[in-house]
Design a protein with these regions (language model features):
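Cytoplasmic membrane-interface "Motif A"-like loop-to-helix N-cap segments
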Residues: 50-62
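C-terminal ends and interior cores of transmembrane alpha-helices
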Residues: 64-76
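Hydrophobic core of transmembrane alpha-helices in multi-pass small-molecule transporters
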Residues: 80-94
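Intracellular juxtamembrane helix-capping segments at the cytosolic ends
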Residues: 94-107
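A late C-terminal transmembrane helix in Major Facilitator Superfamily
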Residues: 106-140
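A membrane-interface helix-boundary motif in multi-pass transporters
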Residues: 136-155
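Multi-pass alpha-helical transporter architecture, strongest
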Residues: 154-175
Length: 175
């Protein structure tokens, strides 16, 4: 995760006299707190999807994260940055927590194993390729790497939101 270095950069810009230890403590605290939100997201978004439907819950996660990532492009306030990152991790955990039931509800129990396998493979591939893309951006444009990374992520979220509009929850198991 590059949330800690980004937060440290924001604090350093705000107060250049902060020690490396203080900056590392701020970054470590964000990682610890945001991981709690990751865990809570599994329960929170599961409850939301039970109430409003799987596809609708994913649409809300995608749409709200699109807004959050757009805000991350321009935020300079470390506290606002932390709050936005915690929300992103709430949705990340929510994605993992609701994905099995989402796939089953949208694609049916017969297709569920194959589709869920493909989803997890894609998610894993993104976890490998995404940081490589961010590292390449950071190598080529270190001063604006965060903004570019958040902008690319915003575009990917927009594509996901548009794709989600083609899906619907099925009320009966078609499998």
């Amino acid at each position: 995760s590059f949330q800690s270095p980004l937060l440290q950069d924001l604090f350093r810009a705000k107060d250049p006299s902060l020690s490396a230890a203080a900056l590392a403590a701020y970054g470590g605290t964000l990682i610890a707190v945001s991981s709690i939100f990751n865990g809570l997201g599994r329960f929170f978004w599961g409850a939301v999807s039970d109430r409003i439907g799987r596809a609708n819950a994913f649409r809300i996660m995608l749409a709200t994260q699109l807004i959050v990532f757009a805000a991350l492009i321009v935020t300079k306030n470390p506290i606002v940055f932390c709050l936005l990152i915690c929300y992103v991790l709430l949705c990340y955990g929510g994605g993992f927590g609701t994905m099995p039931s989402f796939v089953n509800t949208v694609f049916g129990s017969t297709l569920m194993p194959a589709v869920y396998g493909a989803v997890l493979t894609a998610w894993s591939a993104a976890g490998i390729v995404g940081p490589q893309i961010i590292a390449a951006i950071k190598d080529r444009a270190p001063e604006s790497a965060a903004a570019w990374s958040f902008a690319v992520s915003t575009g990917i979220l927009a594509a996901g939101l548009l794709a989600s509009l083609t899906l619907r929850d099925r009320t009966a198991d078609i499998g």
